[in-house]
Amino acid sequence: PNREDMLFPSLMSSLDFYGLPKMAYYYARRAYEDRVLCFREQTDGSLIIYGCSETTDDLDGELEVRLTTYEGKVLWNLRQDACLAADSAVPLAIVPSAVLSAVPSYCCYLAAVFSDERCSRLKNIFHLTAIGEWDHVALPQAALHVDIHMVSSCEFELIIDTDVFVQDVVIEALDCDVYYSDNA
């Protein structure tokens, strides 16, 4: 959560507390992507989903927001048309506080996905848990699926997919250089 009383560096978003784009976010995801989705908690307990764009043109598409348990059950869903306005950070949707307070914060997360007609996709996940609540989260046993593709005689691509949310997946690659990307 991005709250005034919890300014822990790993919790920072791409918006400051005035709802304006934040430059400090560039060293993370925004350094690689011109458009991102981010979340901003309000004092009434609701959550605003922002679309941030550094491009010179608007992007029309569809926004889907899902409140999902770690087992994969969708508890709440919102689907609507949205526009990522050029060179700005604009509110795209609001998740009401009544929706967020209806479930324990450690059992689910919010996923926001923006897609357009060119099949571009932006995705971001917001965990409702506070810093000290991760010990209450009970993640189900995941069914990991791994695909390995040879890129060249000395390069391969490893794709890991799962049926539910997972954390702490460990990949060991011995005696070789490893380049990691989680941009999918």
Where does each model-flagged region fall?
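Carbohydrate-binding surfaces of carbohydrate-active enzymes
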Residues: 1-184
